């Protein structure tokens, strides 16, 4: 089973972000709702009203079903958007914080609690778009094994998926989203734990970590946030879904690229992986954030080799996209390579190209 969640920004013809997710959801659902079914996908709200979520109405059995259904969902969503455009990436390259609007309908008390604790008027809240992947587990043993394997893979997954090199019209890190994400809850560091989770030996141990977060939130009067989703590490356990949720990836330029990341992760999780100390993982995550795949290529090539060895026939078909990203650079790296001069005009031109990639399901080269 495969459970993807995609986040895309809503834009006008000049790629100014437009905060109208509530209007789109009202058009689809008949009233202002948190989410609404559109064909075989579900369209949902996010904290920021210029971002909209796409997820399947039910988990997928195969990668081909994933690609076909979610691309169909993108096209159906575009058909009800009155000419507005969708854009992937981990951050909107032109968004100004003063122009961002926060969801002000149902669930707003959750966002109000976050704002009271952390001041959400920052890029780490209002300008991040991720591709999240839910990996199911059938037993506690499998959940613990998957959690610990994904923990070791997080820096490498982040490197291949890094796709947020521009913020407010200027170049930053290759994965600028990750930089802001890591500090957006610094007042309660237990929540994010520098993205790398602790190695666990049981789900009881995981629940103990989660309860520690809850205790700190209760001390601050934020009872409404004491839910399993508040944990912001790069992988978390979703007991309500019986799955692990990977949160470290930037949204990509098209559905095919998201499917390729999924194929890579599913295959490599079948391999034996070497345990690494937390300080080494943080160092590698810092490298992924700053320069994408550039300084991690030997390890990434070895992981790609292992993933191919453990991949099924369908997964292997998508490995060429991952190979391209490892050898030629992540989406964020490619963007910087193709933009020797960063100007508003060049960024708009880039956004036009990336928006077409999403519409046509084409990988950006």
From Swiss-Prot:
Q: Name one GO biological process term.
A: modified amino acid biosynthetic process
Q: What's one Pfam family here?
A: GCS2
Identify the domain of life.
Answer: Archaea
What is a single molecular function from GO for this protein? glutamate-cysteine ligase activity
- Signal sequence bounds: none
**Name the UniProt record assigns to this protein:** Uncharacterized protein AF_2307
């Amino acid at each position: 089973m495969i459970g993807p969640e995609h986040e895309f920004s809503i834009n006008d013809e000049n790629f100014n972000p437009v905060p109208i997710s509530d209007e789109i959801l009202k058009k689809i659902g008949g009233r202002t709702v948190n989410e609404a079914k559109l064909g075989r996908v579900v369209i949902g709200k996010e904290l920021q009203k210029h971002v909209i979520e796409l997820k399947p109405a039910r988990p997928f059995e195969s990668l081909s079903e994933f690609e076909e259904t979610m691309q169909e969902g993108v096209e159906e969503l575009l058909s009800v958007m009155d000419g507005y455009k969708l854009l992937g990436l981990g951050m909107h390259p032109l968004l100004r914080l003063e122009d961002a609007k926060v969801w002000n309908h149902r669930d707003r008390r959750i966002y109000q609690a976050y704002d009271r604790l952390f001041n959400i008027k920052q890029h780490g809240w209002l300008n991040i778009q991720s591709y999240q992947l839910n990996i199911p587990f059938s037993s506690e043993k499998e959940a613990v094994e998957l959690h610990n394997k994904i923990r070791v893979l997080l820096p490498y997954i982040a490197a291949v998926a890094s796709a947020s090199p521009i913020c407010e019209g200027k170049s930053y890190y290759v994965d600028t989203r990750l930089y802001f994400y890591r500090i957006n809850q610094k007042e309660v560091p237990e929540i994010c734990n520098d993205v790398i989770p602790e190695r666990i030996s049981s789900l009881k141990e995981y629940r103990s970590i989660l309860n520690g977060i809850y205790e700190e939130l209760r001390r601050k009067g934020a009872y409404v946030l004491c839910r399993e989703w508040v944990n912001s590490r790069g992988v978390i356990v979703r007991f309500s879904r019986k799955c692990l949720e990977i949160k470290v990836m930037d949204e990509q330029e098209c559905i095919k690229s998201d499917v390729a990341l999924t194929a890579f992760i599913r295959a490599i999780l079948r391999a034996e992986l070497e345990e690494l100390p937390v300080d080494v993982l943080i160092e590698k995550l810092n490298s992924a954030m700053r320069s994408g795949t550039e300084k991690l290529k030997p390890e990434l090539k070895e992981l790609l080799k292992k993933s191919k060895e453990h991949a099924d026939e369908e997964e292997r078909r998508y490995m060429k996209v991952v190979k391209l990203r490892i050898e030629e650079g992540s989406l964020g790296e490619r963007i910087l390579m193709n933009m020797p001069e960063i100007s508003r005009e060049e960024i708009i031109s880039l956004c036009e190209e990336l928006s077409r990639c999403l519409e046509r399901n084409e990988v950006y080269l």
